[in-house]
Amino acid sequence: MPLVWYEGKVLKLELKEIEKIAKENYSAAKLQNKWYECVNFALYLLDEKIESENIYILAGLDSDDYDNINKYFFAVTNELKIVKMDEDINYNFLCYLGRKVHNDEIEAIYALTILEKMYYQTNDKRFWEWVEFGNAVDLLEDGITYYEYDINKDNLCDYIKEKILLDIDLYKEQLPDNFFKMAFCEKCKKLVIPEIKKTLFRKKFFYKCNNCKATSKFLWCSDNKGKKLYLERKNSPNTRFNADIVDKPQIQVRRMLDK
């Protein structure tokens, strides 16, 4: 049976969306053993009135029939001229999770658990911040608010949803070194790595801007608000963004506290 595409006419935009969903669903199959998502891709195509013998066979397979799912999924993607399925697989999986969470198909907390594990599974440094964020969520459960994240028990799920979408936008950006230790100074508006200072009796620490030396509040790049501001400045045609970055080595908090 030949491939039927709306009587032979499919817009390029539709083709791009089809390729996007194919790669996202395949990433879930490959990284999380969710091979039923390849079957779901065939069902999606049929809903879009895109038909072929291979699509019908794939749509009818049991979710645990790995060998045939793999065989017919690639037969379908070949028909659709979709290539390089393994390219950017980690990014595609992040997009997959973003879609699932946005559509309320999986819970935000469950997505957080998956993303924490992704760092250890893939060694992709982009996922390390999810490990740190997970630690902050654990502290929140104990009634402790971590300074870098504007989270509470009421906004946590919405925060995670937004965080995933922002990380999708940031994933392919060429970020500065130590980006997730950077912050925007409230006073001078520069992007800096705040210096850690201790009080006289060394019982407390505070942050100081290494540009204007103010001890004002900081908008951390690990937080959603900081990421949004970074993207706004990065994409603004009127901002000399690189000139606004003040990057100096930071002494780690734990090391300071141990002294």
Language-model features and meaning:
Residues 2-259:
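Acidic, Ser/Pro/Thr-rich low-complexity regulatory regions
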